[in-house]
C-alpha cells in the first residue's frame, strides 16, 4: 500500500481548476502566493531540474525559452522558477532535500543564485501593451526610471536607461505565453507610432538579459 491521500482541495464538493496561472486579479496566482503553495504540488522532474539549474550559480547566462504544447506544464515550471528567484533559500532547501531523498547529486548540490527581483506576467492577457510598461510598473525603482524616460520624449527607452535601472536592482523577467502575445501585436498608426510588431524581435535580449556587473540572466 502506498498510503496515498488526496489533497484537501480535492475533497470538497467541487473540483478546483488545475491550470497554473502566474498572476490573477484576486492575487491567487502562483507567483503571488508563497513558494510552498507551488512546491507542495511539484515533483522534481527532469524538466524542473533543468529549469532550476538555469537559475543556479552554474547557469549558462543566457535567456531561457520554454517550448511545448498546451498542458505540458510550462506555466508550472515558470512558477517554480519565479520562486527560485524570489525565495532562493526556500527553493534551494526544497531541491536539496529532494536530491538527498532521490540520491540525485545535481539536486542535492544545487545552489541557486540570489539577488534578483522576479517580474512574472502572463503577457497574453494584454494588461501591458509594451514590455517596458510592465518593467517600469513592477521594478522597485520603476517610477523613478519611468520619469526619466518620460522626460526624454522618446518613443523607446534607450538601452543605457534600462541598464542603469537593472544595475540598481537586477531583474529576472519571466513572461508566460510570450509568443501568443507577440503574434497579437500591431504597429501604431502614423509616422510617430510605435512599431510594436518589430521592436521585440530586434531588442528581446535587452529585456531578457539584465546585467549586474559581469552577470546576466
Each predicted region: which residue ranges?
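Walker A/P-loop-proximal flanking segment of P-loop NTPase domains
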Residues: 1-72, 79, 85
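Phosphate-handling catalytic cores of nucleic-acid transaction enzymes
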Residues: 26-27, 60, 89-100, 189, ...
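Residue-level preference for the first positions of well-ordered beta-strands
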Residues: 61-65, 118, 170-172
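Flexible phosphate/Mg2+-sensing switch loops adjacent to catalytic phosphate-binding sites
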Residues: 82-117, 144-156, 194-198
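A short hydrophobic beta-strand->loop->alpha-helix junction that borders the nucleotide-binding pocket
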Residues: 117-127
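Short glycine-rich substrate-engagement loop in P-loop NTPases that contacts/grips substrate
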Residues: 127-162
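Substrate-engagement module of ASCE P-loop NTPases
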Residues: 159-167, 193-217
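Conserved P-loop NTPase "ATPase switch" module shared by AAA+ and STAND
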Residues: 165-197
